[in-house]
Amino acid sequence: MTVDQNAAAEPKEECRSVRILVVDDNPAVRHYLRALLEQQATWKVSDEARTGAEAIQRVTKNPPDMVLLDFQMPDLNGLDVARKISGLFPEIPILMVTIHLSKQLTDECRRAGVRGACAKSDVGSIVEAVDTLLHAGTYFPAMSSAER
């Protein structure tokens, strides 16, 4: 048996974790999103924020690879936070997660620099949206006339 010395000496490519900031004022929702995201081998919730101001501060201090952002928070709404983050760090994809998904909100999200939006209750959409955004895509589900 022969061993290829060059093959043995080659460094293995490391799988770098994708660092995700989860922003939601509800601790139960943050826990749910963390559990959902960390089922993926290379996705890691690197930080959490409870308010819009806290999210902006955390992104500025230690920019993540992606932001999952709640729309409705006590201080700033998700659109205001998204505008600020995308203005400072346009390369960071932002996914708006909300219980109030509508055609109007998705249009406003696009204008605010958000690259995707989905309902918090749709587990499959959240995973699909994160994956799409991490591969430089956008994710805005089609809205039926009843949802507009």
Question: Language-model features: where?
Answer:
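Non-catalytic signal-transmission and effector/linker regions of two-component phosphorelay proteins
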Residues: 1-19, 127-148
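Conserved acidic segment of CheY-like receiver
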Residues: 16-29, 33-37
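Active-site residues of response regulator receiver
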Residues: 24, 70, 98
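Acidic catalytic/metal-coordinating carboxylates
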Residues: 51-54, 77-80
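Active-site beta3 strand of CheY-like receiver
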Residues: 62-68
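The feature encodes the CheY-like receiver
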Residues: 74
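Alpha4 helix (beta4-alpha4-beta5 surface) of REC/receiver domains from two-component response regulators
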Residues: 80, 101-118, 124-128
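A short, hydrophobic beta-strand element within the central beta-sheet of small alpha/beta folds
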Residues: 91-102
